[in-house]
């Protein structure tokens, strides 16, 4: 069993973005390739959770396993993806990553995993005053809490956090690097993120 593993939530077609975000072009590759390059530099084991409509395309791009949600919970949002990844890889802690934050740095995973300890169920950053539960780390024991929520047809990350002993991190090293956590939800945000990248 690894101490740490990574779970990337690739999702599928995005109505707001107009295409699958995981496959959007970024730095000569795609969002998903860039995120995996960063994660695999820090984590030995990483799995991608993908919607069936893009799974084959993602598999051609990446060198890590690509799976779909556990059938019973298919389509139940990020909680289903996280628990599916936890079932696929055995680890003590899981670093979660959405596919629409392409600016993430390997330094972030070093900071995040450095904050984990057995007394906590989760480590979650607070960026510009907002909790970021999909850019966080969760202990293996959270798996049972997720199953309990899904059984009750609850899909909210906020509901999960309310049941966990969470260590929130909002230190200088996090706030000074808020651009690591930029989410790209629309084409406008995508254009802006590319501009910001070329200005660096």
From Swiss-Prot:
Tree of life domain: Bacteria
Enzymatic reactions: Mo-molybdopterin + GTP + H(+) = Mo-molybdopterin guanine dinucleotide + diphosphate
Gene Ontology cellular component terms for the protein in this record: cytoplasm
Binding site for GTP: 9-11, 21, 69, 100
GO molecular function, one term: GTP binding
SUPFAM superfamilies, per database record: Nucleotide-diphospho-sugar transferases (SSF53448)
Cofactor(s) in the UniProt record: Mg(2+)
Enzyme class: transferase
Chain ranges passing through the membrane: none
Localization per record: Cytoplasm
Binding-site positions, Mg(2+): 100
Stated family: Belongs to the MobA family.
Protein name: Probable molybdenum cofactor guanylyltransferase
Species per Swiss-Prot/TrEMBL record: Bacillus thuringiensis (strain Al Hakam)
